[in-house]
């Protein structure tokens, strides 16, 4: 009996010493890369072609080949909102890429902002996150690390706006002429 009891403190000491209480290293750069409608097998299929920064992301980043988010309408706006905020898009009003706004009595783009002006070109539409009173990943990073810069770039307006969150430093998206533009919601 004495023999078996002597092992108990030794095992307890081993487990308590082997537990690592240190915090993980905080990364200097966080990139959320979303490729709309890209199948995950294409990442490995063309693996030998990747070089530079993309090669580094493939070798050292975290990527998900079978990620799912539960919402019924899988258009760009709702999907990118779910990724950028971790919330169900319909609950805050992102019910599609465009929808009928009862207050305005017209069909609107999900990131339409009638109070914003285009910055960066003469043509294009001003977009912003102003319709949504919620935060996202970029906002959480800035709230935890005040020196952080959040920049959201997308080919589509709703991609840049909805993945950037409420207060990114910049959101850039293409206009119909193929130029990157923004709105005065983000820059002056």
Residue ranges, per PLM feature:
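Bacterial N-terminal signal peptides that target proteins for export
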Residues: 1-8
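Bacterial N-terminal signal peptides
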Residues: 8-16
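Bacterial Sec-dependent signal peptides at the C-terminal "C-region" and cleavage site
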Residues: 15-26
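Beta-strand elements within well-structured catalytic alpha/beta cores of enzymes
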Residues: 27-39, 57, 83, 141
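Second-shell loop/turn segments in exported
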Residues: 39-45, 69, 123-128
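Extracytoplasmic/secreted cell-surface and envelope-processing proteins
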Residues: 41-43, 76, 160-163
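Short, structured active-site-proximal loop/turn typified by the sulfatase FGly-forming signature C/S-X-P-X-R
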Residues: 44-91, 149-153
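His/Asp/Glu-rich, glycine-adjacent segments
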Residues: 96-188
């Amino acid at each position: 009996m004495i023999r078996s009891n002597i092992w108990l403190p030794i095992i307890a000491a081993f487990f308590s010493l082997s537990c690592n209480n240190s915090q993980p290293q905080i990364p200097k750069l966080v990139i959320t890369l979303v490729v709309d409608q890209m199948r995950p097998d294409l990442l490995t299929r063309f693996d030998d072609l990747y070089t530079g920064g993309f090669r580094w992301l493939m070798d050292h980043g975290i990527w998900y080949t079978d990620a799912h988010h539960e919402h019924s309408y899988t258009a760009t706006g709702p999907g990118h909102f779910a990724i950028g905020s971790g919330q169900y898009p319909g609950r805050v009003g992102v019910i599609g890429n465009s929808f009928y706004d009862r207050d305005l009595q017209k069909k609107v783009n999900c990131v339409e902002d009638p109070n914003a002006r285009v910055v960066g070109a003469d043509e294009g539409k001003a977009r912003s996150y102003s319709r949504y009173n919620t935060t996202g990943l970029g906002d959480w990073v800035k709230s935890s690390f005040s020196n952080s810069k959040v920049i959201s770039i997308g080919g589509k307006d709703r991609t840049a706006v909805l993945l950037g969150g409420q207060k990114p430093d910049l959101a850039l998206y293409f206009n119909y002429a193929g130029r990157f533009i923004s709105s005065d919601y983000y820059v002056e």
